[in-house]
Amino acid sequence: MNYVLEIKDITKSFFDIKANKNISLKLKEGEIHALLGENGAGKSTLVKIIYGILKPDSGSMFLDGVKYSPLNPDSARKHGIGMVFQHFSLFESLTVLDNLILGQKNNISRADILNKLSQMQHDYDLFLDLNKIVATLSAGEKQKVEIM
């Protein structure tokens, strides 16, 4: 069986401290998982490895059965891997749309961004007024903008 994400024996150390030691997990499509543990247990380290912010010392990852080695967050995003940060990184005085356009790279046209946002809103039930000022949004709405 292919898993959406499979992690095998990921280890990451910082000097002589092992943040992650032989971590393995398998995620099927549609499943929801949570990483739970004390402060310093290595949860953020593992997420950063999956997202391409950190490189593991050893181990391997697979997306849909294909070896996956992100070089950076851009590489991870190209494989459909994203990350939502605990604290918002939005410009409060700008609209939702302006924040989303600022976050785009590679000279994507405004029309392409609007089409992509429309599709995401439909596919993931992330409906928001794109002309609303971010400061007026609830915390949940801001989280939706971060996801988009």
Question: Each predicted region: which residue ranges?
Answer:
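Glycine-rich phosphate-binding loops of nucleotide-dependent enzymes
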Residues: 1-148
